[in-house]
Design a protein with these regions (language model features):
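Glycine-rich phosphate-binding loop of ATP-dependent small-molecule kinases
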Residues: 1-182
Length: 182
């Protein structure tokens, strides 16, 4: 089993590169964003709560995210046998520590963290373009600025956390999809 965290700012290409890694290595993909958007679309209790945070560009509380993740892993035991790529999680050091505990209970660990590093102007351009193409409500300029501020304040410290754990691998995320994957 090989578990990978794909790390980067909103719009850095986490979802796109996750798809490439999944196809190449056969890992099970967990996008906490996709899981949450599914709950929002189905108007579940979790979806209603999550939507309040997402629509304001805020992070979902750690305890709630851990519960969602654990439930999702429990429901996909067979699919995750080769390993998991975590896309959009963890986003805080507390979540990283909780993920470590969760995986240790399952006899495994985070093996690598792929950090997609993209300059901020490119991030804004990508996100606004994605918003136009997909109609995602959280891909507008005001929310993008909030999401990037939250990323810098709350998520960026994870980079050093995983560097200290000797698991962080920085990748220049400014190129084409193919050049980034290589």
């Amino acid at each position: 089993m090989f578990n990978v965290v794909i790390f980067g700012a909103p719009g850095s290409g986490k979802g796109t590169q996750s798809e490439r890694i999944i196809d190449h290595y056969g890992l099970f993909h967990i996008s906490t964003g996709d899981v949450l958007r599914d709950h929002i679309a189905r108007n579940t209790e979790l979806g209603v709560i999550a939507n309040k945070y997402i629509s304001q560009g805020q992070l979902i509380p750690d305890e709630l995210m851990i519960r969602v993740l654990e439930h999702h892993l429990d429901n996909h035991t067979k699919e995750s046998e080769k390993g998991v790529i975590f896309d959009g999680f963890p986003r805080t050091i507390a979540q990283a520590k909780a993920l470590t505990e969760l995986l240790e209970k399952r006899g495994t660990q985070v093996d690598a963290v792929v950090g997609l590093e993209v300059n901020e102007d490119e991030l804004v351009t990508r996100i606004l373009k994605r918003g136009q193409e997909t109609g995602r409500s959280d891909d507008n300029l005001e929310t993008v600025k909030k999401r990037l501020a939250v990323y810098h304040n709350q998520t960026c410290p994870l980079r050093q956390f995983y560097i200290d754990e000797k698991k962080y691998h920085a990748i220049d995320g400014n190129g084409t999809v193919d050049s980034i994957f290589e």
